[in-house]
Swiss-Prot record:
InterPro entries according to UniProt: Ade_phspho_trans (IPR005764), PRibTrfase_dom (IPR000836), PRTase-like (IPR029057), UPRTase/APRTase (IPR050054)
The organism of origin for this protein: Thermobifida fusca (strain YX)
Keywords, ordered alphabetically: Cytoplasm, Glycosyltransferase, Purine salvage, Transferase
Protein name according to UniProt: Adenine phosphoribosyltransferase
Coiled-coil residue windows: none
Recorded family membership: Belongs to the purine/pyrimidine phosphoribosyltransferase family.
Amino acid sequence: MSTDVSTLIDRYVRDIPDYPQPGVVFKDITPLLSHPTALRTAIDALAEPLLGSEIDLVAGLEARGFIFAAPVAVRLGAGFVPLRKAGKLPAETLAESYDLEYGTATVEMHADAVPPGSRVLIVDDVLATGGTGRAAVDLIRRAGGTVVGLSVLLELGFLKGREKLADVELRALATV
């Protein structure tokens, strides 16, 4: 990815120690979100490598992945699918549980959100342990979709989340 984008992320993503629990260093993207040029640059950088690709849907992971996934979907001419925390969707759902850096969780989507054969890009803000990404990939595939890749703003390389996603094309705008 461009050095400019990586530098921008380094400048506008701050570390919050011991959040949400002691020992975790949380990557706070809110400074990037409040800076219009930084936000636009990040969204463009997530979308541009895939312009002209056959992508039917962009799936965004709750909550911060939504911020990037919806505008990426618009840029790619694709629909948007929210992947939500358990119990947040009103219709019948498919669910996948996973481990994350600081606990366990479940991700859900509407059972009819991904028609079989759909080509789906997954977008999130940060790749940490890879648990959330792995659950999203498995969920999309279980619905009959084809995962064309996983794109993230920031990869925490030291947590080795990429290893859980060896079967998926992974794009990170920056790695720390």
